[in-house]
A protein has these predicted regions:
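DNA-contacting surface of Y-family translesion DNA polymerases
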Residues: 1-105
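Acidic, metal-coordinating catalytic segment for phosphate/diphosphate chemistry
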Residues: 65-189
Length: 189
């Protein structure tokens, strides 16, 4: 059982728009929440980071700029994607503006989400002042996970994850996934 779940990816090309970073963070949060539910856990803390692209000087090898992160402790542990996306998007915006003010850059190469403070979802402690999402939200998430697993990934997704995804990783050189994708299986004629 994992104590922390992270989903991070490089962008296909450097990103400058806050909207693209928010879409990426929402997508990564959704993916991390799926992993969290697979291990029957709930997270009480979420961290978001962005990595600005640094200009390369002649003769210098490529490197990332220093990452800018933001973290928050949630009012109660949860594995419900919608309850994780909202604070993640707020932190993404905060990290974006902080990076621009500190590093004077508007190009970003990478973003990520980390869920920590993971506890079993059977032993969740409630909060007297915050209404619990209840079992219905968990059942909805399980139904979404089952549909996405049986049909294909991302057939059902949250609108905040975006539709076009221009920031998505390039995968032209990826090896075919013969053992896990029917549509990539070779045909003999």
């Amino acid at each position: 059982e994992k104590k922390m779940i992270a989903t991070t990816r490089m962008f296909g090309s450097p990103v400058s728009e806050l909207r693209d970073i928010k879409e990426a963070v929402a997508t990564y949060t959704s993916r991390a929440a799926e992993k969290l539910r697979r291990q029957y856990g709930a997270a009480s803390m979420i961290s978001v980071f962005v990595v600005p692209k640094e200009e390369r000087k002649p003769g210098q090898s490529f490197r990332h700029g220093p990452s800018v992160s933001s973290a928050i402790t949630l009012p109660h542990a949860t594995c419900v994607t919608s309850e994780l996306i909202k604070p993640a998007l707020q932190m993404a915006e905060k990290a974006y503006h902080k990076s621009i003010s500190e590093h004077k850059t508007q190009l970003f190469k990478k973003a990520g989400v980390m869920l920590s403070g993971i506890v079993p979802d059977t032993t969740l402690q409630g909060n007297l002042f915050i209404p619990a999402s209840g079992n219905n939200a968990r059942m909805l998430m399980d139904a979404m996970d089952n549909i996405n697993f049986s049909m294909r990934n991302d057939i059902l997704k949250f609108a905040s994850t975006g539709m076009e995804r221009n920031w998505k990783m390039r995968q032209e050189l990826r090896s075919p996934r013969y053992t896990s994708r029917w549509d990539e299986l070779r045909e003999v004629k």
